[in-house]
């Protein structure tokens, strides 16, 4: 399968476990799948694989943690489940797995801080494992909101995968609601600024191959991604606008 899909075998094992986890917890109430893993598994046809799972939750973190743990502990591939970061409405579960002597860990991030802004949706989860995992769907954050969170992430943190996912969102022709992006920036305490998306470009470039190569079936250059984002979000115009505002103040 690894050769057929173009991904490294260890990452496909991890993706299989990750997909199995989604299948097992799909009926738990009050959890809404989101983030880069959701975007790639639902809307983008797997240009990259993932290593973690993100949810917005509408119940207490401890309640959801208990329900997920109860379901997963019964599965033979799960060796143990521990609690990672637990800070003010955010809780990380760490699932340690062992499948045919291939061991690893998957993060399940539960976030109650980020409130649902648009109505939740239900989407089919695309995957490569039809012979082992049935077709299934699960509750998700709305597509438009999910996309807005991803774009906001390019302005609020410094992870190459955020820029890569946004690049693929643009190529897929998905709607990017900038007003919703502004709301997501505000709710996470970050400034909405197109220029912030490119502020640490050199750091992103330095991390690009190390961070992205293991996740991709087909390599893509940092330059291609950053140029596409600069054109779509009109970086040149944003710089000129900032320059003119500065001149007026002086």
Residue ranges with predicted function:
Residues 36:
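Active-site glycine-centered loops adjacent to acidic/histidine catalytic or metal-binding residues
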Residues 1-31, 41-48, 53, 58-250:
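Structured mid-to-C-terminal alpha-helical surface segments
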């Amino acid at each position: 399968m690894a050769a057929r899909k173009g991904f490294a075998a260890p990452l496909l094992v991890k993706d299989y476990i990750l997909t199995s986890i989604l299948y097992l917890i799909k009926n738990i109430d009050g959890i809404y799948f989101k983030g880069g893993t959701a975007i790639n598994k639902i809307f983008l046809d797997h240009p990259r694989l993932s290593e973690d799972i993100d949810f917005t939750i509408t119940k207490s973190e401890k309640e959801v943690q208990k329900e997920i743990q109860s379901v997963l502990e019964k599965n033979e591939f799960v060796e143990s489940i521990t609690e990672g970061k637990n800070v003010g409405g955010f809780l990380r579960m760490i699932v340690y797995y062992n499948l045919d002597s291939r061991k690893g860990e998957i993060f399940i991030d539960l976030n109650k801080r980020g409130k649902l802004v648009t109505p939740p949706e239900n989407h089919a989860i695309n995957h490569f494992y039809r012979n082992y995992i049935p077709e299934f769907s699960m509750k998700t954050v709305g597509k438009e909101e999910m996309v807005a969170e991803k774009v906001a992430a390019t302005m609020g943190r410094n992870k190459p995968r955020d820029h890569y996912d946004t690049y693929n969102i643009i190529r897929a022709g998905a709607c990017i609601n900038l007003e919703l992006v502004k709301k997501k920036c505000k709710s996470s305490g970050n400034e909405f600024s197109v220029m912030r998306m490119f502020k640490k470009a050199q750091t992103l470039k330095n991390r690009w191959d190390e961070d992205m190569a293991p996740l991709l079936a087909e390599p893509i250059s940092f330059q291609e991604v950053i140029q596409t984002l600069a054109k779509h979000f009109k970086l040149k115009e944003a710089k000129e606008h900032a320059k003119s505002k500065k001149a007026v103040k002086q």
